[in-house]
Amino acid sequence: MKKILTLSIILLAVSCAQKPVQQPLDNSVVYEMNVRQYTPEGTFAAAEKQLPRLKDLGVDIVWLMPIYPIGVEGRKGSLGSYYAIKDYCDINPEFGTLADFDSFLAEAHRLGLRVVIDWVANHTSPDAKWVTDAPLYWYERDAEGNLTFTADWSDTANLNYNNPDMCTEMVKSMRFWMERGIDGFRCDMACEVPLEFWERAISELRADYPGMYMLAEGEEPLLHSQCDFDASYSWELHHMMNAIARGEKNIPELLEYLAKDAERQPADAYRLMFTSNHDENSWAGTEFERMGDAAKVMAVLTFTLPGGQPLIYTGQEMGWNHRFAFFEKDPIPAWENNDYTDFYKWLIKTRHDNPALASGDKGGKFEVVSADDSTLVFTRTLPDNKVTVKAELKAPWSYEIVAE
């Protein structure tokens, strides 16, 4: 019996030693993966082989752009938009199979990475499974009974959130993926969906999955205080940084924005900060097109400003200066490490090593040391950790981070 007990303890110790440690959410760095463009193959199987590289880079949360089958009716380009979804509970065959996704997910978890998937709740494709299988009133319709769409999204059909059956099925579809083992969702155009739906969905899912991470594309404070999202987009900050890089905004305006955002957002809100993402890259240009030589110092701000949770988009970690085609195959031909890889590794390690840089109210107090026409110096301070950041926000753009 003593030998059996000893063996059990040894096996338990080995199991615990092998269990990957995930970074706390408040100190995590998000990586947005564009599966179609991530490898020449554009598949989960090929992307899975690259996960150790992401682990080495240091990121913590892998956000997958929509992984579902894409509608054919009204399709844009030859492959279509990821955001025109035909079936919420299946995989785009372009990327592989559900088994391939499960393998990708298992490998990510083995490496200690969280995986969240893009959730497009506002609309489906006009030939979606629900259009053909569900009652007519699951969708918004015009006076003639035709499906409706927003803006120029003619490859989509707006859902009807006044219908409780549709809402119930939407939560059920989200649960399908949580049961499969994902760690949460990035919710597209979150404010285009009634906040009451998010409040219900998050409450019901968190009852069974308390660690679920929720990221909203939107800036409405109620996304946090009412709906209980963890993180929300800092779109206004992003556009402010673009404008500073062009010489159209200045340091006082940046500080005014930060004070306003801190006042209106809940203290524990994570504010997603970025110099690029899939929308900006494809439609507004790369960070180098928009920010020029200021791109690196702006990235430093996304890792160090108060409340922030930093995001890295596909290719940024090697300085990939290319607008990805949105509706076609346009992959990175090969991955290589360079000075941008070293830069982002340094930024991520600096964040992980300094609790004062954590998101929400877990991070250190923000204080401006000095600010003039070109230079901003600020500190983030906890009782046992202090980080000083110096950012030159005019040419020659530069940065310095000192931790103590």
Where are these regions (language model features)?
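Short catalytic/ligand-binding loop motif for oxyanion handling, primarily in non-cytosolic enzymes
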Residues: I70-R75, H123-A128, V193-E196, L222-S225, ...
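A structural motif
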Residues: V59, I182-D183, F229, G307
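Hydrophobic faces of well-ordered beta-strands that scaffold small-molecule active sites
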Residues: V29-M33, V62-L64, V115-I117, F185, ...
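Carbohydrate-interacting/catalytic domains
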Residues: C16-W63, P69, D102, E107, ...
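Sec-dependent N-terminal signal peptides
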Residues: I4-A13
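Active-site-proximal helices and loops of the catalytic beta/alpha 8
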Residues: L105, K172, D188-F274, G292, ...
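A cross-domain feature marking catalytic cores of carbohydrate-active enzymes
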Residues: V35, P66, I117-H123, M189-C191, ...
